[in-house]
Amino acid sequence: MALARLALRNLQQKLSPSLMGQSCERGLVGNRHNPMKLNRFMATSAGEQEDKMNTEVSVSEKKSPRQNFPRRRGRKSLWRNTDDHGYFTPTLNEFFPPTIGNTLIQATENMNRIFDNFNVNPFQLMGQVKEQDDCYKLRYEVPGLTKEDVKITVNDGILTIKGDHKAEEEKGSPEEDEYWSSKSYGYYNTSLSLPDDAKVEDIKAELKNGVLNLVIPRTEKPKKNVQEISVE
């Protein structure tokens, strides 16, 4: 009996619990002379399987750090960037009544159309643009610059505005105890592509109180001949 137990223990150490459970169960079922040994090893195998199941359950119940700290969902934004030009496109009218939402959408589309005509990005255009039936109006703030400091050129459909201003002021004299010298420098440079319907030769510019205004006339579009056809 002792030799049999020793042999089975050695077998148990060499084989995996699942394989040992199957081999022991098959061998002991065929041995009818020792039912006590069968019950003992069946109990041992069942106990090992129960311990293994408990271990697996404890591992499966372990939560990952992401579950302990769930990811926050981002808030919905009223404006989102949906194209390659960087234009703002409004979302659906879920934040405003239909009338206000439609007005915002229409205003955004008009601004995007103006930027398309001038081939510029809203963030690159440091000024204001107005589109009228007969002209375009541009407005730039150039504080510290005079009309002598500003130079406007058009080359191959590109409008360029440059401004350069330097000033030096001295107060007092070297002989006095207090002598002050101050320098100021201003620089402005921007370029944009003119629309196809712009009249380059008729562009006018005016600088007043640090504000530069440009008026770009537009060519008249031919009127479309619309003919109504009666339905019989």
UniProtKB/Swiss-Prot annotation:
Keywords, comma-separated and alphabetical: Mitochondrion, Stress response, Transit peptide
Presence of the UniProt keyword Mitochondrion in the record: yes
Record GO cellular component, one term: mitochondrion
A GO BP annotation: response to heat
Region listing for Disordered, in residue ranges: 44-82
Every sHSP domain range: 114-232
Feature: compositional bias, Basic residues: 69-78
Subunit (UniProt): May form oligomeric structures.
Protein name: 26.5 kDa heat shock protein, mitochondrial
Organism name: Arabidopsis thaliana (Mouse-ear cress)
Gene name for this UniProt entry: HSP26.5
